[in-house]
């Protein structure tokens, strides 16, 4: 997200985390610091194989609460990053591209290195491609690290999300299918989706 008003509107919906893309190749890349950054929602910085010093500097400049890594960052990289950012970053998320149960094996070396995994759709482009993978693949996930479900979840998927259960599911990622244009969220679509999910839980 990049626009101050849109950030305020989305935060007002009670969203837990708000993401800011710091990968220059992304159409959602944050070119400059927004005039407003979330005060109640956690600030998530998304990086792809970035120089570790760049991540550290960005995390400090934006007062990030969470770092989300979408590249081929190693467990050693994550350990080093955590030591550099321990004063302000509380959580590190590592994303993995998933298509088959075999893909889940790549998470094993990261157990204990990261706080959450994020399971995204395997595609040529990194993130935000609007397509889903077969969530039943995650029935084979037996890891101890909680995960965030990502990959093409849209406004029409509320019932599907409510029907999905896994003991390690920690949350869902709402991205490109809730946008009017890259980096700008449709607040009405988000509100309706969130209300549908919450009503089911009451």
Per-region residue spans from a language model:
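Conserved N-terminal beta1-alpha1 strand-loop-helix module at the mouth
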Residues: 1-202
């Amino acid at each position: 997200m990049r626009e101050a008003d849109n950030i305020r509107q989305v935060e007002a919906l009670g969203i837990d985390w708000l993401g800011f893309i710091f990968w220059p190749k992304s159409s959602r890349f944050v070119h400059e610091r927004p005039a407003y950054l979330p005060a109640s929602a956690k600030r998530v910085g998304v990086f792809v194989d970035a120089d570790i010093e760049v991540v550290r500097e960005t995390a400090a400049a934006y007062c990030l609460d969470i770092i989300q890594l979408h590249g081929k960052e190693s467990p050693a990289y994550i350990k080093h990053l955590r030591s550099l950012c321990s004063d302000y970053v509380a959580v590190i998320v590592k994303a993995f591209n998933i298509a088959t149960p075999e893909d889940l094996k790549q998470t094993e070396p990261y157990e204990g290195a990261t706080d959450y995994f994020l399971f995204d759709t395997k595609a040529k482009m990194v993130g935000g491609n609007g397509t889903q993978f077969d969530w039943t693949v995650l029935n084979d996930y037996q890891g101890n690290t909680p995960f965030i479900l990502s990959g093409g979840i849209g406004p029409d998927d509320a019932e599907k999300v409510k029907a999905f259960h896994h003991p390690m599911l920690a949350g869902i990622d709402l991205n490109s299918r809730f946008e009017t244009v890259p980096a700008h969220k449709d607040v009405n679509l988000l509100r309706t989706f969130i209300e549908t999910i919450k009503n089911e839980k009451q």
